[in-house]
Amino acid sequence: MSGFYSHRSLDGVLTDGEITSIYKTGLHRSQKEADKKNLFTMQLTGGNVSYQQNRIRLGITGIYYVFNRPYEPQLTGYSQYNIHGNQFYNLGIDYAYRWHRFSFQGETAMGKQGSATLNRFQYSPVEGTQLMIVQRYYSYNYWAMFAHSFGEGSAVQNEQGYYLGVETSPFRYWHILASFDL
C-alpha cells in the first residue's frame, strides 16, 4: 500500500482567469516563456493498493487532481473531447497471472469521462523464445495528465489496435525481434 500528495506550481497560459494551456517543457529561455511560469497550482493526491499471491497479482490505483483555476482549453478539432473544469480523477486496476510458460497482464483505467485498457498475453514455447499479443483500447474522451502507454500516438487517447511480436535468441549474442501493429 502506498499514498502520495503533491502541491506544485505549473506553467501555462491564463485567459480571463482560466487556464487555456498547460506547458510541460519547464523551459524559460525567453521573456515570453518566463511570463508563463508558475501561473497556477495543481494539487494531487492518490494511492495504490496491491495484492499478490502465488501466480496472481491485483492492484487498484487512484489519483485526484485539483487546479486552483478552471482549466478551459479551446475545444476544437481533435481537442474537442479534452477535459475541462478544475477537478479530475483517474482510477485503474492492474492485474497479472502467470502459469508455466504463459503470462497475462494488463491495466484498465477510467477517468472523469472515458476509459482505457492495455492487455498483454505472452507464451514462451521454448527457452529464449517469446510470442506475444498486446491489445490496446484508449477511448476518444479518456484523459490522464501523466499517462504514458504503448501506442502509435503521443497521447493515451483515441486509439485501438493489436501488436503481435516474436522474440528469440537462437545463438549467443543474437537477438531477433519481428513484430507488426494492426
List where the protein language model places each region.
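Transmembrane beta-barrel domains of Gram-negative outer membranes and organellar outer membranes
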Residues: 1-13, 74, 78, 101, ...
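Exposed, low-structure sequence patches enriched in small/polar residues
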Residues: 38, 42-73, 80-182
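Flexible, solvent-exposed loop segments that connect beta-strands
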Residues: 23-28, 72-79
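Conserved catalytic alpha/beta cores of large enzymes that bind or transform nucleotide phosphates
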Residues: 34
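Aromatic- and glycine-enriched pocket-lining scaffold segments that form the walls
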Residues: 1-29, 38-40, 44-48
